Amino acid sequence: MAIAALSNFTVPLASDQSSATQGLLMPKLQYRFRISFEGLGGSKGQNTVELTKQVTEAARPTLEYEDQTIDIYNSRIHYAGKYKWSPITIKLRDDVNGYVSKLIGLQNQRQFDFYEQSSAASAGEYKFTMRVEMLDGGNGAHSPNVLETWECLGCYIQKTTYGSLAYKNNEVVTIELSIVFDNAVQTGTTAGLGIQGTDQTRGGTKTTGG
């Protein structure tokens, strides 16, 4: 009886909208995530797994459409203009072996040669891919399941903050990155954005994504 009562821990719904025995679905948790990088630092870059280990804070993508307005008699009509992805902030611990600092330095050097004062011929020479994965909490002998994956494509580091220092503080030294990217898609079984599918519109069935 006590176990059955757990199904009541949710919003009341009609029986034709939700199963009477289904309670609240388990939400994803903020601390169960993994950030990985592909191509950051270029051919001279070390193993980017060290970056993944040292991430302390991150974020998922933020998508925004530019609101456009058509003024008409006595009113206005709104429609979605071009979209934009907001930069993602990644905070990492700065390890004593210098792996994190070196990789970030190599990536910034790819974007602009600070010694020769020379820039890359094209953006494709320095852009990389970043993945934001939500995990289910598994570890060790129980491999984690990936609940959601965001692939951020065409990334570059817009801003690098090497962090403050203070004699009175015991906290670890961090490096904060602001990463700009061209596009983002969701992958995996729970993906909804950027995948191939069909959608019913007033004009009929259309294929999306792919």
Tell where the protein language model's regions lie, with residue ranges.
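Glycine-rich, low-complexity intrinsically disordered segments
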Residues: 1-210
